Design a protein with these regions (language model features):
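Cytosolic regulatory regions built on CNB/CRP/Popeye-like sensor folds
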Residues: 1-149
Length: 149
């Protein structure tokens, strides 16, 4: 169930945004507006956050806990592509490529994430072409790396 973000969490997200390369092209006001549109959600171990092939609707910032990303190889094999913990973003690549999810992401332990909806992210990209261009470049590099696994 979705919950509102409290003051302490807002400050934590703001600090993460300041340190993440992906948000350096945004003004303070743009970063704060993004945070105001986010919400908090909790997951239990083995909860599937999204599956490879799903349409993207949100990206996630891990506050507590860990996730594991896997990619299908052939029909029955799965390859672990990443394990992410607090302060990590995931799911944003699909916003830029307009393609389905490229991996399945599952909670490895009890976790809390902050969620940013695709509609909010797209609104920001339309207002900031330089940021959009930079993110597309970053996304292309990540996609090449992922497809080589």
């Amino acid at each position: 169930m979705a919950e509102e973000i409290d003051t302490k969490e807002f400050a934590w997200i703001s600090e993460v945004f300041k340190k993440k390369k992906v948000f350096t092209g945004l003004s303070y006001t743009e970063r704060e507006a993004l945070i105001e549109d986010m919400y908090k959600i909790s997951y239990k171990p083995e909860d599937i956050i999204f599956k490879e092939g799903d349409d993207p609707t949100a990206c996630f910032l891990i506050y507590k806990g860990k996730v594991k990303g896997t990619k299908n190889k052939m029909l029955v094999l799965k390859k672990e592509v990443s394990t992410l913990g607090p302060g990590s973003f995931f799911g944003e690549m699909a916003f830029l490529t307009f393609a389905p999810r490229v991996a399945t992401v599952v909670a490895e332990e009890n976790m809390v994430c902050f969620v940013l909806l695709k509609s909010t992210f797209q609104k920001l990209l339309s207002k900031n072409p330089a940021f959009k261009s930079w993110l597309k470049s970053l996304s292309a590099k990540r996609l090449i790396k992922l497809n080589s696994l």
